[in-house]
């Protein structure tokens, strides 16, 4: 495959995370020749989403990754006298302390297959009692005896769309498209609902159903392609930088979104819904009439707090938590503002930080729905793929499973000249963007990383029952003691195309102080109970039951300055992995900053040209983007219940 690649590009991007994908799209849109490579077999890096079997394969890859022994660098012969090489790392050390627990009944048989699976490695199919299964499913831990796990591995990592789970709104049934991960060195393909219907037979939903409330592990395996499990758990602020970029660049046409329907609070051992809009506040039965007036008055002030500096003068240096106590708010209102609206730390957030966060929350209300947040159908892993698709449309070349052995640096200028790939091909470029996980240890010896604690749960019911079982919720559980951090809980229903019917996908996230399980297990125990056969028929069980759980720590390199990396060439730019924040603003800011260094004074991801405005002048095309091209046209196949950013933007403004 190497001889088919051109030998020279303007920009080479290594890694397909969200920041790298945005930069690749922006550079390609600006006319640069872009090569975008990743040694992984899937798009997104630590921003990726996986089907259930794909996630198990990912876990196995990380176990095998820890056993990699560096080979003798055969590319050294290609390094000239006036050059030196920076060997890139083959080990990804961004994920640690992985632990998997399976609570669902493990009546797994060898003939159970994932619906729509294209290829299976039978050597990796194991029985429920096999200790080999646990070893292949997660990295060894000190407490392996607590984790029983059986798994069916597939060599494919491809999540799929589900035309059967068509969304319904006002009686109208509609379907949409799902963009698949690539398994080879090709550009991002899209798969239509009609194509996917061949892989996921409609008859699957009408076959034998398990008895009420009983979900087995084999059923999760069989329905594994209905899961799209994110490695990083985030939401999109409706007026955040990423939404604005999606609309501006017209990349929004490649994705669909759903509104977060509920904001929840956990108080005195109970989960309750929090009012956040004006209508919610005045319709709330949780607040007294006096509290409603107090809350609306305070929120009105927060919307324009910069105009009234006297209101917070002298309080700038204290925490937002202490400031709220001075505002004559009841403890109930203080809790709601602190943990469900501002969503800031009681100990680490200043008054100004809290006021900014509250204003941002209120500013995003009402643009697309009753809450400030959106979630992409099929998971966060769709977003990097959307920008990769834009890059490919404008000529970018994509190669997955394509390792870069080293960066070639000129000794005199201290600039990077080229890369040498796994086939020994030298590829020249002017600019290089590298995801930080590819850098060797000697280059990162002065870097101090933070960690993110993550948990992913598959449960059988929502944390707060309502008439509808299709709720998407966010809940913040405050820190219990000094030195720990608040835990963010995002619960996704099956209409988000991230889990099978009858289940919920729950993501827990916090800044790490210990291992992920140590940080998050206490919150899990407050909200959920393990699934056991004895409780299946017990209708008095109030908490959701955990069918399957995954804990892991992920590196957070978002605040690392490039000066912390040793001997970094001036034309090599570092892209960090996900941060612990709820939104994606950090990734967008990083991408725009690096783009301006590569392409100064050029527009960042401008709208694509309207085909009607393209003027043919000799052999050159001179696209002129009309105003209307910045807002996507309605698609006849788009989800009506989900959010089309362009359409709603058009109607709301």
UniProtKB/Swiss-Prot annotation:
Compartments where found: Cytoplasm, Cytosol
Keywords tagged on the record: Cytoplasm, Disease variant, GTPase activation, Sensory transduction, Vision
Q: Which InterPro entries match?
A: FAD/NAD-bd_sf, GDP_dissociation_inhibitor, Rab_escort, RAE1_2_domI_C
Does the keyword GTP-binding feature in the UniProt annotation? no
Q: Could you tell me which residues belong to the region Disordered?
A: 606-653
**Major location (coarse):** cytoplasm
Q: Annotated Gene Ontology MF terms?
A: GDP-dissociation inhibitor activity; GTPase activator activity; Rab geranylgeranyltransferase activity; small GTPase binding
Please list the GO biological process terms of this entry.
intracellular protein transport; protein geranylgeranylation; protein targeting to membrane; small GTPase-mediated signal transduction; vesicle-mediated transport; visual perception
Question: What Pfam families does the record point to?
Answer: GDI, RAE1_2_domI_C
Q: Where is the composition biased (Polar residues)?
A: 623-646
List cellular component terms (GO): cytosol; nucleus; Rab-protein geranylgeranyltransferase complex
Q: State what changing residue 507 to R does.
A: In CHM; impairs the interaction with RABGGTA
Q: What does this protein do?
A: Substrate-binding subunit of the Rab geranylgeranyltransferase (GGTase) complex. Binds unprenylated Rab proteins and presents the substrate peptide to the catalytic component B composed of RABGGTA and RABGGTB, and remains bound to it after the geranylgeranyl transfer reaction. The component A is thought to be regenerated by transferring its prenylated Rab back to the donor membrane.
- Identify its protein family: Belongs to the Rab GDI family.
Subunit structure, interactors included: Monomer. Heterotrimer composed of RABGGTA, RABGGTB and CHM; within this trimer, RABGGTA and RABGGTB form the catalytic component B, while CHM (component A) mediates Rab protein binding. Can associate with the Rab GGTase dimer (RGGT or component B) prior to Rab protein binding; the association is stabilized by geranylgeranyl pyrophosphate (GGpp). The CHM:RGGT:Rab complex is destabilized by GGpp. Interacts with RAB1A, RAB1B, RAB5A, RAB7A and RAB27A and mediates their prenylation.
The record names the disease as: Choroideremia: An X-linked recessive disease characterized by a slowly progressive degeneration of the choroid, photoreceptors, and retinal pigment epithelium. Affected males develop night blindness in their teenage years followed by loss of peripheral vision and complete blindness at middle age. Carrier females are generally asymptomatic but funduscopic examination often shows patchy areas of chorioretinal atrophy.
What's the protein here called?
A: Rab proteins geranylgeranyltransferase component A 1
Q: What is the lineage of its organism?
A: Eukaryota, Metazoa, Chordata, Craniata, Vertebrata
Write the gene name.
CHM
């Amino acid at each position: 495959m190497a001889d088919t690649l051109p030998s020279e590009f303007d920009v080479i991007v290594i890694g397909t995370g969200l920041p790298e994908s945005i930069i690749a799209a922006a550079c390609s849109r600006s006319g640069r020749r872009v090569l975008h490579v990743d040694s992984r077999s899937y798009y997104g890096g630590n921003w990726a989403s996986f089907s259930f079997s794909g996630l198990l394969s990912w876990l196995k890859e990380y176990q095998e990754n820890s056993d990699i022994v560096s080979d003798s660098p055969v590319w050294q012969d290609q390094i000239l006298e006036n050059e030196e090489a920076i060997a890139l790392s083959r080990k990804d050390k961004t994920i640690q302390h992985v632990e998997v627990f399976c609570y669902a009944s493990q009546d797994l048989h060898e003939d159970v297959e994932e619906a729509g699976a294209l290829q299976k490695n039978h050597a990796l199919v194991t029985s429920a009692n096999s200790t080999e299964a646990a070893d292949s499913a997660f990295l060894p831990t000190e407490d392996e005896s607590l984790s029983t796990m059986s798994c069916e591995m597939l060599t494919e990592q491809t999540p799929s769309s589900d035309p059967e789970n068509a969304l319904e709104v006002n009686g109208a049934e509609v379907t949409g498209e799902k963009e698949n991960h690539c398994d080879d060195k090709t550009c991002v393909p899209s798969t239509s609902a009609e194509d996917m219907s061949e892989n996921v037979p409609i008859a699957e939903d009408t076959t034998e159903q398990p008895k009420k409330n009983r979900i087995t592990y084999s059923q999760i395996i069989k329905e594994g392609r209905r899961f799209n499990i994110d490695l990083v758990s985030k939401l999109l602020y409706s007026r955040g930088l990423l939404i604005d970029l999606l609309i501006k660049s017209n990349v929004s046409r490649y994705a669909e979104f759903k509104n977060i329907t509920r904001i929840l609070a956990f108080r005195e051992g109970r989960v309750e819904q929090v009012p956040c809009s004006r209508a919610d506040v005045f319709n709330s039965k949780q607040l007294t009439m006096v509290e409603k007036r107090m809350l609306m008055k305070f929120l009105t002030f927060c919307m324009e707090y910069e105009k009234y500096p006297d209101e917070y003068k002298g309080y700038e240096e204290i925490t937002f938590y202490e400031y709220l106590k001075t505002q004559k708010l009841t403890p109930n209102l203080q809790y709601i503002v602190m943990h469900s609206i501002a969503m800031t730390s009681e100990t680490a957030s200043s008054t100004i930080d809290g006021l900014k966060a509250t204003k941002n929350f209120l500013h995003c209300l009402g643009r697309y729905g009753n809450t400030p947040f959106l979630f992409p159908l099929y998971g966060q892993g769709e977003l990097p793929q959307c920008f990769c698709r834009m890059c490919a449309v404008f000529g970018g070349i994509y190669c997955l499973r394509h390792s870069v052995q080293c960066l070639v640096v000129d000794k005199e200028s201290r600039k990077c000249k080229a890369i040498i790939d796994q086939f020994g091909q030298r590829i020249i470029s002017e600019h290089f963007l590298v995801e930080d996980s590819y850098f060797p240890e000697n280059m990162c010896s002065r870097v101090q990383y933070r960690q993110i604690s993550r948990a992913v749960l598959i449960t059988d019911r929502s944390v707060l029952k309502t008439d509808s079982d299709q709720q998407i919720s966010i809940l913040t559980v405050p820190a219990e003691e000094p030195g720990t951090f608040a835990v963010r809980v995002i619960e996704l229903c099956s209409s988000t195309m991230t889990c099978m019917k009858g289940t919920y996908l729950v993501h827990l996230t916090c800044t790490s102080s210990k291992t992920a399980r140590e940080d998050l297990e206490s919150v899990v125990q407050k909200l959920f109970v393990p699934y056991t056969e004895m409780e299946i028929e017990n209708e008095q069980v109030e908490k959701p039951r955990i069918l399957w759980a995954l804990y892991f720590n992920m590196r957070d390199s978002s605040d690392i300055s490039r000066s912390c990396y040793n001997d970094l060439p001036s034309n090599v730019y570092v892209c960090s992995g996900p941060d612990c924040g709820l939104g994606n603003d950090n990734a967008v800011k990083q991408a725009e900053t690096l783009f301006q260094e590569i392409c100064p004074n050029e527009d960042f991801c401008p709208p694509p040209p309207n085909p009607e405005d393209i003027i043919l002048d000799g052999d050159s095309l001179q696209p002129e983007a009309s105003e209307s091209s910045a807002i996507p046209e309605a698609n006849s196949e788009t989800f009506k219940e989900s959010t089309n950013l362009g359409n709603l933007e058009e109607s709301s403004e």
